């Protein structure tokens, strides 16, 4: 399986889980949303029912429109601006992070939502990087003579060996 296939599986799984969660939430709060919609559109419903000849129902919606709708509209406006401000702050904070940190945050979120698909993606990336590194190292190892490798190894040991002139 390729990296792109694994990546699309992760994205598909994350989106499907988010949509499923939103469906569950929507099913739970459906009555509340219906009541809010009726109150929010009460001025229009009052005019509609009055013009249709249902003056009693139009009067009920008219009283809702004058008492509850302004409060609800103010609350929804305040809530919407607060959510917009929060989302804007979160997005600008995320954008200010480095590319590696952004990748770590997104990978962590994906691992929480879709652990199996994320593990498969990480395995694919590790395998691909290992194959590429093996190909490059194998090509370089065949191109250089052996004495250069021995000299480079000796130089690395000399550079990494702790010195005996420690000043304590």
Swiss-Prot record:
Keyword Cell membrane found: no
Keywords on record: Fusion of virus membrane with host membrane, Fusion of virus membrane with host outer membrane, Membrane, Transmembrane, Transmembrane helix, Viral envelope protein, Viral penetration into host cytoplasm, Virion, Virus entry into host cell
GO CC list: membrane; viral envelope; virion membrane
Highest taxon, organism lineage: Viruses
Compartments (UniProt record): Virion membrane
Major localization class: virion
A Gene Ontology BP annotation from the UniProt entry: fusion of virus membrane with host outer membrane
Assembly and interaction partners: Interacts with P3.
Designated name of the protein: Fusion protein P6
Biological source species: Pseudomonas phage phi6
Lineage, highest ranks first: Viruses, Riboviria, Orthornavirae, Duplornaviricota, Vidaverviricetes
Encoding gene per record: P6
């Amino acid at each position: 399986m390729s990296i792109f296939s694994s990546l699309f599986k992760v994205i598909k799984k994350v989106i499907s889980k988010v949509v499923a969660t939103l469906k569950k939430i929507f099913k739970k709060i459906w009555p509340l949303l219906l009541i809010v919609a009726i109150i929010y559109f009460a001025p229009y419903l009052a005019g509609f029912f009055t013009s249709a000849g249902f003056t009693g129902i139009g009067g009920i919606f008219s009283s809702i429109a004058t008492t509850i709708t302004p409060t609800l509209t103010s609350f929804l406006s305040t809530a919407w601006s607060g959510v917009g401000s929060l989302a804007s702050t979160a997005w600008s904070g995320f954008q200010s992070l480095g590319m590696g940190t952004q990748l770590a945050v997104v990978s962590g979120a994906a691992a929480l939502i879709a652990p199996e698909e994320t593990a498969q993606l990480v395995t694919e990336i590790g395998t691909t990087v290992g194959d590429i590194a093996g190909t490059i190292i194998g090509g370089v190892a065949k191109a250089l003579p052996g004495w250069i490798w021995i000299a480079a190894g000796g130089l690395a040991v000399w550079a990494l060996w702790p010195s005996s002139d420690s000043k304590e």
